[in-house]
């Protein structure tokens, strides 16, 4: 070589090693003017072209280098890498094997074969080749790195962790390995360790957007949601076109109640990737939480359209259908979810709930059993299994399973006091003090108070009955009660009793069955003086009908169980009927000024407690109520009562019957299909007209 050409080559190499590729390329091309077939210069230009993404040009240059000197292993290795980039794996492997044939201990080329196999999804073969590379060079970190990636792809997470850790032990500068190791550890739920490795990644490479995103995932799993949000935002600032980071940010924002921001992040993720199924699913979750069921349904359907193999999407869609009382469609989609993912306990549980709503208790119980088999301590499944057993009339098994409610996070079953006393299981405890406390709703207390008189003869205990203020006067006449006390979240009565039992556990403790339910009525008694006063106030002709159209608005099933006053108003037009409202609370304001032809008076606003309501009911000829405490009260008083039930009734009303084993004077009117109050009121109007004509005779 001439001196000036040699200097050009040295200068080009210096620029190339320093990463100044444009200057290096310019100098290499000057050399080519003097030596157009120099294989090393052609190869170097090929490497630069590959780095710039000019893959076809890179292939031409390296092939020219090989043509000039086919005995250089490095040239074949580089060609193999280029061909892999071109999507020609077989040709790439052939080139790389040629490099190894020229240099049998060429570990770098061997790992490149593994990477080509990895890119083609041939992970098992790639692992074998990595092991070949390690035979050639036992301390080759890149071989452990590649093998770790393949093990991870095969789901062999423990082995992947070991391989990645060996790579880092050999070469702590492999930033990508810190990131990938963090991902695997997160998938193993080892989030503390994952976060530690991912922090190393972002410390070593602050502009590594993917590592910031993955650190956010680990931090969110550890409950550090605010820090996770900052990580996602950093990833997005570094790489705005990063749909996964926008998606993860949406999930974190949603968990913090930042729904508007979460929706915006979902939309951004979808803009960047229009077929991003998980982003549509996340958007659906946020919209559903905001009450936009229609929007949520559209999103879930788009998620399924983009990826129809995700059980979670069908499960979420089914939840919306169930909330809309479209139970057959809910069942259909829950079934798709469990077919796609048989080990999905929540989907089996949700399917069971939908089947229960359809009245298919046997299939529902089988699905609860499947959910419990997958997750043995699944308290919600056990508790709802109890409701299905009770709904079908299997009280013995139902009461036993009903004990699981204590393990369910339900405010309705949480007693305000923290007990340091044992629960009574039906044993003899003569001379000891037994606290019987109420739980759930007023109607539950009224229904189950019938069992209290059986306690003292069985236990020999001093019976202390604790209940809520609206029931105190009503329960004063209950036999077998030594002390009646008012429940209070401020009072801690641990020193006042020796054992305790929930009023809802009495059927279980006492072994009650469908045949042994105490059904003598009345078992509650109104105030005689108040009854007389109401009778005088309501004296006159016509059938006096007390009505209740809505329960507590915060009740979980209020949308289905309550109706509107206007639906009752048609009954006021029946000749000889006089309607009286027994309604308290905000729903009482639904009543407009009634027209003269449909006289109506709401009496409920004057009730101070349920004794007032009971005394008023005693002056009524009939009570018509949706499923509320007032229906139970009328039944407990032995008053004629018609109870209006949603298509999917509460367990206590059972199925396929128009009477109640709990209340002999009660008649049940059931919706023939979900939310069909029209049919119910048509039937009631017909029956009420018959009753009116009979009373006139």
Language-model features and meaning:
Residues 1-622, 627-697:
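Alpha-helical solenoid repeat scaffolds of the TPR/TPR-like class and their adjacent stem/linker regions
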């Amino acid at each position: 070589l001439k001196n000036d050409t040699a200097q050009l080559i040295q200068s080009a190499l210096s620029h190339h090693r320093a990463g100044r590729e444009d200057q290096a390329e310019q100098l290499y091309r000057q050399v080519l003017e003097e030596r157009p077939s120099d294989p090393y210069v052609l190869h170097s230009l090929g490497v630069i072209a590959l780095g710039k993404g000019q893959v076809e040009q890179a292939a031409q240059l390296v092939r020219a280098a090989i043509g000039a000197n086919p005995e250089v292993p490095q040239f074949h290795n580089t060609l193999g890498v280029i061909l892999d980039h071109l999507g020609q794996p077989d040709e790439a492997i052939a080139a790389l094997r040629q490099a190894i044939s020229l240099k049998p201990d060429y570990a770098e080329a061997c790992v490149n074969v593994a990477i080509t196999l990895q890119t083609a999804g041939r992970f098992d073969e790639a692992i074998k080749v990595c092991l070949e590379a390690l035979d050639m060079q036992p301390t080759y970190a890149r071989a452990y790195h590649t093998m770790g990636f393949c093990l991870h792809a095969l789901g062999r997470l423990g082995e992947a962790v070991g391989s990645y850790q060996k790579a880092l032990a050999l070469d702590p500068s492999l930033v990508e390995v810190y990131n990938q190791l963090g991902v695997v550890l997160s998938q193993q739920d080892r989030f503390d360790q994952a976060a530690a490795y991912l922090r190393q990644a972002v410390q070593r490479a602050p502009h590594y957007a993917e590592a910031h995103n993955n650190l956010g995932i680990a931090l969110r799993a550890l409950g550090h949601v605010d820090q996770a949000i900052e990580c996602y935002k950093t990833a997005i600032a570094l790489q705005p076109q990063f749909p996964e980071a926008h998606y993860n940010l949406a999930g974190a924002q949603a968990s913090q109640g930042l729904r508007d921001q979460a929706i915006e992040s979902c939309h951004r993720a979808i803009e960047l990737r229009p077929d991003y199924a998980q982003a549509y699913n996340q958007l659906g979750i946020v919209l559903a939480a905001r009450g936009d069921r229609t929007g949520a349904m559209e999103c879930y359907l788009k998620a399924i359209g983009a990826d129809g193999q995700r059980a979670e999407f069908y499960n979420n869609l089914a939840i919306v259908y169930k909330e809309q009382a479209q139970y057959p469609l809910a069942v259909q989609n829950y079934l798709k979810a469990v077919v796609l993912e048989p080990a999905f306990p929540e989907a089996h549980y949700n399917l069971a709930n939908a089947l229960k709503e359809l009245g298919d208790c046997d299939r529902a119980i089988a699905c609860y059993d499947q959910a419990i088999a997958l997750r043995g301590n699944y308290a919600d499944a056990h508790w709802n299994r109890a409701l299905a057993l009770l709904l079908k009339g299997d009280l013995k098994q139902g009461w036993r399973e009903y004990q699981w409610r204590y393990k369910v996070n339900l405010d309705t079953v949480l007693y305000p006091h923290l007990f340091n006393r044992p629960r009574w299981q039906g044993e003899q405890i003569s001379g000891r003090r037994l606290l019987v406390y109420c739980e759930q709703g007023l109607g539950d207390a009224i229904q189950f108070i019938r069992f209290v008189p059986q306690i003292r003869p069985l236990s020999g205990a001093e019976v202390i009955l604790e209940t809520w203020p609206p029931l105190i006067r009503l329960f004063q006449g209950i036999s077998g009660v030594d002390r009646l006390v008012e429940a209070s979240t401020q009072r801690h009565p641990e020193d006042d009793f020796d054992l305790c039992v929930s009023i809802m556990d009495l059927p279980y403790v006492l072994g009650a069955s469908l045949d042994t339910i105490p059904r003598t009525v009345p078992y509650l008694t109104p105030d005689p003086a108040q009854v007389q006063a109401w009778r005088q106030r309501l004296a006159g002709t016509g059938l006096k009908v007390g009505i209740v159209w809505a329960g507590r608005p915060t009740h979980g099933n209020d949308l289905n169980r309550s109706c509107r006053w206007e639906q009752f108003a048609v009954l006021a037009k029946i000749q000889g009927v006089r309607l009286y409202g027994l309604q308290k609370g905000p729903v009482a304001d639904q009543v407009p000024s009634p027209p003269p032809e449909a006289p109506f008076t709401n009496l409920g606003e004057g009730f101070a407690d349920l004794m007032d309501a009971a005394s008023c009911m005693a002056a009524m000829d009939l009570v018509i109520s949706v499923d509320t405490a007032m229906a139970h009260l009328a039944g407990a008083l032995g008053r004629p009562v018609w109870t209006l039930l949603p298509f999917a009734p509460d367990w206590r009303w059972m199925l396929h019957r128009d009477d109640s084993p709990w209340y002999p004077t009660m008649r049940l009117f059931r919706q023939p299909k979900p939310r069909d109050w029209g049919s119910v009121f048509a039937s009631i109007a017909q029956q009420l007209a018959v009753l009116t004509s009979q009373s006139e005779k």
